């Protein structure tokens, strides 16, 4: 059974739900596939569900109850003649905001991450296992997501958000 909430809506008809979690990818994702029509009436979901709408996906069995399996935001809505697909992204969606161009010199990774979270409105704590200092780090025509991706690519770290805490750790290290 399921309970899927998007913005102010609760979805009844669902064709398929795929949830993908991986610390190797920056964000966890969920893909929700919905029928395009019900009782030969077009649902026009793309007019009701918008990018940035909150998404909570509860899945389970009647015997054991529902469990929150995914929480995040609608990243995009796509339609074809058969179905509507909602591509959703976890809390890292909030990092898809443009950040002001900036040049940092001699900045620790933790301080850089603090500056990054402050640039998108703050409210995050940082859990970082790395101690290094960047000689130079540039934000140029980028989003906070782009900056995190660059950090992840450079050091191979596991990067994820958990309860408003941004985690950056070596791949083999188990944290939070």
Sequence positions of predicted segments:
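Short beta-strand-centered interaction patches in the first periplasmic/extracellular domains
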Residues: 83-85, 89-92, 124-176
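Assembly/oligomerization scaffold segments
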Residues: 1-94
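Extracytoplasmic/secreted envelope proteins and their assembly/folding machinery
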Residues: 71, 110-113, 145-148
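Glycine-rich, acidic and aromatic/proline-enriched surface loops and short helix-turn segments
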Residues: 77-80, 108-125
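Second-shell loop/turn segments in exported
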Residues: 98-106, 135-138
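Generic solvent-exposed, charged/amphipathic alpha-helical segments
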Residues: 56, 113-117, 149-152
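Solvent-exposed, flexible loop/coil residues
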Residues: 15-23, 99, 108, 130
């Amino acid at each position: 059974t399921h309970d899927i909430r998007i913005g102010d809506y609760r979805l009844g008809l669902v064709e398929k739900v795929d949830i993908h979690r991986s610390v190797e990818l920056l964000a966890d994702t969920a893909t929700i596939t919905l029928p395009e029509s019900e009782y030969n009436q077009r649902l026009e979901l793309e007019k009701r569900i918008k990018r940035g709408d909150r998404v909570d996906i509860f899945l389970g069995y009647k015997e054991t109850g529902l469990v929150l399996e995914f929480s995040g935001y609608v990243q995009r809505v796509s339609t074809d003649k058969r179905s509507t697909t909602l591509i959703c992204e976890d809390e890292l969606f909030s990092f898809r905001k443009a950040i002001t161009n900036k040049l940092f010199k001699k900045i620790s990774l933790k301080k850089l991450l603090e500056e990054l979270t402050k640039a998108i409105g703050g409210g995050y704590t940082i859990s970082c296992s790395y101690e290094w200092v960047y000689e130079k780090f540039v934000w140029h025509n980028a989003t906070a997501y782009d900056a995190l991706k660059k950090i992840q690519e450079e050091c191979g770290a596991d990067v994820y958000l958990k309860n408003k805490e941004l985690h950056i750790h070596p791949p083999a290290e188990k944290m939070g």
